[in-house]
Structures are given as C-alpha cells and as structure tokens.
C-alpha cells in the first residue's frame, strides 16, 4: 500500500535509519539538489534496454544496492507532476512492499519552505531486498485482452485517446476504454496529487464504477501510475497495465479510433 504523507512527516524521519529517502526524479535533477540522505532511483533504472521491467532478481539487486532492505521503510519524493514517484511506488507494491510513503509536496515546495537541501552524493549501504511478487496489482496484455468486465482507464492526453497524436504507430485507444487525463489528477500549489474530494469528483464524472476491477494504462506506464495511485486511494480494485498502449498497438489487437473515417 502507498500512503501520501506531509513534508513535516518526512522531516521528522529524514535522519531515522529505519527509513530510506528515495528521490524518484531524473538523475540530473538529483544532482542539482536533493533531500538529506536521499538516494536516486528514477524510472529508467527500472527497465532493461528493451523497455521491459527488470526481473525480480534484478529489482532485488537494484533496490538492495540503493539501501532499501527488508526492514527499511521507503519514503519517495518527486518533482511537479508525480509520475515518477507514483510509478516507483507501484513497482514496490508489485515487489510486495506494503509500507510505501510518498511525500505529498514536490521537491521545489520543500526547498521553497526553507528546508535543507544537499548536493553531494549520498553513500549507500547495501542491504538485502527480498521481492515477494504481488501479481494482483499488475495487468498483462493477455489479462487485459481476455478478461471480461474490466473498466479500462486511459490516462493519456485527450489527443492520444482520440487518435489525433502522431506519437502512436496506430492512433486511438483500447476498445471500451474511458479517458481520464492524468494531469487532471495532479495537485496544485506544490502538491503532487489533487485533493481526495476533487479526485472523487473526476472519477465519478467519468462514470467509473467502484464495483468493477479497473485497469489503468497510458503509453508506457508512468502516467497510468498516477491514475492507479488515485484510484487505489479512493478504494478501487485497480491494476496497472505496464505494457500499456505501446504493447497493445504492436499486438495486432483491435484499436478504437474516433478520428478515423
């Protein structure tokens, strides 16, 4: 389970050896300043050269080398839109962790409040990380294409959903999907996610039924993680299709394109 926590909550634990601060921003951002004791684990490190998620053993090596042991509690933080932290948190959920925290304010807000930031790399203490795969949070291409009664939530831009984007080989969306643009779920005034009441209003307006299993997707998974974390927070049974539309459009499965003749 992933919980969003305040900057004050993080500040009181930032030097506690039972917690590990994980900067999920891209490496260049990390080098330009980071929280005390933070190690850098951005999403690109979670995939191989073919764009596939690492194996459980590779994840164990990655997170163990970063200092995340089985008895250490992770605290993630991010920049303005929350995609990276949401995706890294989902990965940790998939690996069986249920003690994940994300700082709800963005790094720039932390810095703007006059809190300490640091610039030197943090020495890492390697620890044992044991994956305990939780397959219930992950949806495969086979699952999405063969399971009846799913609610598919497309978190890409409206242009992508409507088949108006040149970024897709086969423009459109997975048949039957509902559009909820991920940016509508991002918070304001230095917060990563929108208020729970606003998130509920957006989800209700999209007519997403809480009694159905929901699968979020985007192009390659990161934007879908924002939708995943939002829906999880609202009590939905939700999975993330990490192959997302990039895998779907290559599969030869049907595509719905409202923009086609």
Regions found by a protein language model. Name each.
Residues 1-58, 150-167, 173-181, 191-198:
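N-terminal intrinsically disordered, low-complexity segments enriched in P/E/S/T
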Residues 2-6, 108-172, 253-261:
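Active-site neighborhoods of enzymes that stabilize oxyanions during catalysis
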Residues 17-19, 71-73, 149-150, 210-212:
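Loop/turn elements at helix/coil->beta-strand transitions in domains of secreted/extracellular proteins
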Residues 22, 40, 73-76, 152-154, ...:
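Structural recognition of the beta-strand scaffold that forms the well-ordered cores
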Residues 46, 54-143, 172, 211-212, ...:
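Thiolate-centered catalytic microenvironments shared by cysteine-dependent enzyme domains
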Residues 194-210:
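A short, acidic, amphipathic alpha-helical segment used as a generic capping/interface helix at domain edges
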Residues 237-261:
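Cysteine-dependent PTP/DSP-like catalytic domain, specifically the C-terminal lobe
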